[in-house]
Amino acid sequence: MAADVSVTHRPPLSPEAEAEAETPETVDRRAPEQELPPLDPEEIRKRLEHTERQFRNRRKILIRGLPGDVTNQEVHDLLSDYELKYCFVDKYKGTAFVTLLNGEQAEAAINTFHQSRLRERELSVQLQPTDALLCVANLPPSLTQAQFEELVRPFGSLERCFLVYSERTGHSKGYGFAEYMKKDSAARAKSDLLGKPLGPRTLYVHWTDAGQLTPALLHSRCLCVDHLPPGFSDVDALRRALSVVYTPTFCQLACGQDGQLKGFAVLEYETAEMAEAAQERADGQALGDSHLRVSFCAPGPPGRSMLAALIAAQATALNRGKGLLPEPNLLQLLNNLGPSASLQLLLNPLLHGGASGKQGLLGAPPAMPLLSGPALSTALLQLALQSQSQNQSQGQKKPGILGDSPLGTLQAGAQPSNSLLGELSAGGGLAPELPPRRGKPQPLLPPLLGPSGGDREPMGLGPPATQLTPPPAPVGLRGSNHRGLPKDSGPLPTPPGVSLLGEPPKDYRIPLNPYLNLHSLLPSSNLAGKETRGWGGSGRGRRPAEPPLPSPAVPGGGSGSNNGNKAFQMKSRLLSPIASNRLPPEPGLPDSYGFDYPTDVGPRRLFSHPREPTLGAHGPSRHKMSPPPSSFNEPRSGGGSGGPLSHFYSGSPTSYFTSGLQAGLKQSHLNKAVGSSPMGSSEGLLGLGPGPNGHSHLLKTPLGGQKRSFSHLLPSPEPSPEGSYVGQHSQGLGGHYADSYLKRKRIF
């Protein structure tokens, strides 16, 4: 009734002023956000009773002072007159947590057993303190109790849930309380509901101390005023506007730490009844070009504390769904991403935006593709993009697994050293329309999709060069053998190449892939010394040509005990026209390990595959020869073929599945099946052939010096104790390679 008296008798207003306030002009100037119809007294009574019942519905009690040996059954017997929903006894602390049917039973149990005795020990019974009570404020006044329960129920089991109504009008004051069974449910509800838009309002959620919440403190004394005019900063004008009924004890505009206005203000009145009368009068009042919206704050804290809490809640609501750091702009994103990722981000809408109808960062996509092929357009745009960020990339480039960054080697205005399909390898036998190229850097990886050596020259692609041994691959992906070699007598300077996979250490020269655009994957440099020591002719473009060694001519398909040796010499002559002074041709020696091979060719034996030296004239001819000669079926126990052939096959694993002579047979027939000569594709992904003078590079076991030059490569396995035979019960290459690898790994 105090609220009615204060509203009826308004000391600051005279009857004339009150009449003036009720004039249509003044009424028209008020535009509250929601006009609620008046309620009948019965509805008001029901709402108030529900709020009081829910407020008192604290049914959890805490019993202290229990004996140390008390049991759960004793507590049930003690509270036998009540309906227990939950009971937990802590014997170490002598306490019991009990949940009864409702708040009335809890109040009755407290009145009955508080300060009573159990086994000569005095008990203390009281309500359990709760830390899972939330106050949800800034609700729409038209929100019903059922809608409020539906809003807060999804986050966990509710202990209490009620709205706070005006005792005079019965309308909601725009805030309510929700208590959960568990604190984590309340924390989840606070996190999800804070800043959530509900109709025209944004929810504010606060923790509430249930111990300090009384029926009198359910009603708030603070008001929140928003919808202020833009840039409004006159606190005195706001105070006068809301002092028509009662003068507030606290009035302040919200400002951030940077001094920026937040667009709302907080006012505090002496009593909850004064605050209710001021809210009813000022809600929708015109101030400047805006109509104020006045709502109740959460009850409890004073006005100054509530202002700080609302500022923090507004900042949290504005940052809802965002990270702790500000969102980076497009320029920062492109700078942090690599050139390839930035290019893909920019090109995807252009290349594929026509189907989706969306415009990308570069605008609407063209009606036709930029270039005839996506690979060509990507490469050209990548070069253009890199030329713009040259200074940045040079300061940040770091060597990767395969060496320096490929983008860091681009120079401004430099042209690519090869076409998108790669450069052809140097050597004789090129087609007339393709002149031989000399001194080109050679990538480490072999041609994966290129045709075999026997088919390259008819196609006009020219013969490839030697490659280091990569991991094994399917038969259809094997590369070509080492054939046509340059006959020039002087080195030529080579421009630095660009690789898509990075630049490796600077001491490799290997052949180039004409199909996968892997030009200069490993740049060429510092191989002058190693090329003369049996690198399979990889450095022949930088040495003066030497006369080839004389070798007897071998008829194609020859047989006999010396056919293998002759074929070996013939192949060495055809493959290696440039002889080495340090590798005299001695194919008949039984111990091929005596040759002066470099110690750093050991890693080439990894996954290596021997050539077929007994194939006779199936060498680098352009013809598809018929099946292998009869020398395949002859034993190699003596004679001229016993020396190099036995060593060539005994210690050379050919692949994961075959070894020795069986691999040569299978390799020959597989290559014949795919339309290439056996010798033409015998050295692809799975193998390497003999060196410049016909001696296999596979004869050399890696020595200790290998660690200094090629410590980053896997060591090669020792020669298999089973030789070239792999039978049904043979251990095979896999087990032997694992054993030898473990033994050699201990050396490093």
From Swiss-Prot:
Q: Indicate where this protein is primarily found.
A: nucleus
Low complexity bias locations: 675-685
Which InterPro entries does the record associate with it? Euk_RNA-bind_prot, Nucleotide-bd_a/b_plait_sf, RAVER1_RRM1, RBD_domain_sf, RRM_dom
> What is the name attached to this protein's record?
Ribonucleoprotein PTB-binding 1
Q: Where is this motif: Nuclear localization signal?
A: 45-60, 743-746
The answer to whether the entry has keyword Phosphoprotein is yes
Report a single Gene Ontology molecular function.
Answer: RNA binding
Phosphoserine found at? S6, S14, S480, S576, S626, S630, S716, S720
Subunit record text: Interacts with PTBP1, RAVER2, VCL and ACTN1. Part of a complex containing RAVER1, VCL and ACTN1.
Which PANTHER family does this chain map to? OS02G0815200 PROTEIN, RRM DOMAIN-CONTAINING PROTEIN
Species assigned in the record: Mus musculus
Query: What does the function comment of this entry state?
Result: Cooperates with PTBP1 to modulate regulated alternative splicing events. Promotes exon skipping. Cooperates with PTBP1 to modulate switching between mutually exclusive exons during maturation of the TPM1 pre-mRNA.
Q: Does the keyword Acetylation apply?
A: yes
Where in or outside the cell? Nucleus; Cytoplasm
